[in-house]
Amino acid sequence: MIITAELSLYPLQENYEETIISFIKSLKSQNNIAVYTHAMSTFVKGEHKDVMNAITIALESADNSSKGFSLVTKIINRDLPVEKGFLEF
């Protein structure tokens, strides 16, 4: 099943940019998923197991590099057209 997940990471620290960029780079390093970064959130598309595995790995990376964070996640069981408006890292 193809899913689209919208992720917004909010590190609970002053130096938050590094944690967010590391989180996005970790997602982008995973195989079998597509990652689209927008101004306020990042979209991940792919097979359910691949998307969930990529999020788990990225969360472990964020957990090691921050003092705490909040991850707001929305998941839909559809291939949403989120390609327009994304930012390159």
Feature locations, PLM:
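Charge-rich, low-complexity N-terminal segments
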Residues: 1-89
